[in-house]
Amino acid sequence: LVGGRLRRRPIRDVARADLPPHVPTLRELFDTFGTGFDLSLDLKDPDAGPAVIADSLGTDPTMASRLWLCDQDHERLATLRELSPHIRLVDSTRLSRIKEGPERRAARLQELGIDAINLHHSDWSGGLSTLFHRFGLCTFGWDAQFDRILDGLLRMGLDGVFSDHVPRMVDALDRNAVARGLDPLDLNPEGP
């Protein structure tokens, strides 16, 4: 969504020339940074998935395994698997929205070929992370803005976190590695 609080509208309804310059197209993003990284995108527009996949794979066919598409509708998300067997699909939800319970959701995600579940940091526990891992799912936590939250999510065994603060995430990974008796440089060979 773009615009102020009173006039928000879907980005697909806005001409490219009317978007702020800090909002790149996928092509501009890849032209600027290349494709040698994992990219996670929230599909806020239910029709965006096919275009995102086409643009990403049109730029670099190897991007599929590094493209993580997140949607709050896991049934709709699963239909994207037909477009590429290698893209990563992420059910992005809240624990309170999982009416059938976490174990049944995990089983359904496994059945649909979904790769991960992404919950708000406050929804996670170590037991819940273990449950989803038992079904072969990666576990992600979003809105991890503070050290204590990042540290807690990593201690719970989450596979990934979403934060607005890259240096904090790197520091949290280093602290987690030290706590587990590992050398942080083994996890980050390029250094801080």
Annotate each language-model stretch with its function.
Residues P20-P21, D91-P192:
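C-terminal active-site rim and adjoining tail of enzyme catalytic domains
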Residues L67-C70, W142:
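Short beta-strand-to-loop elements that line the ligand-binding cleft
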Residues D31-T32, E82, T130, R155:
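Solvent-exposed polar/charged
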Residues G36-D42, D47-L67:
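Active-site cleft segment of glycoside hydrolase catalytic domains centered on the general acid/base Glu
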Residues A48-T59, E75-P85, E100-Q110:
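Distinct, well-ordered alpha-helical segments
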Residues C70-D73, H86-S92:
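Aromatic-lined carbohydrate-recognition surfaces of secreted/lumenal glycan-active proteins
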Residues L1-D38, K44, D91-S92, V178-P192:
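An active-site metal/cofactor-coordinating segment within enzyme catalytic domains
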Residues G34-L39, M63-L67, P85-R88, G113-D115, ...:
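Short, well-ordered coil/turn segments that N-cap beta-strands
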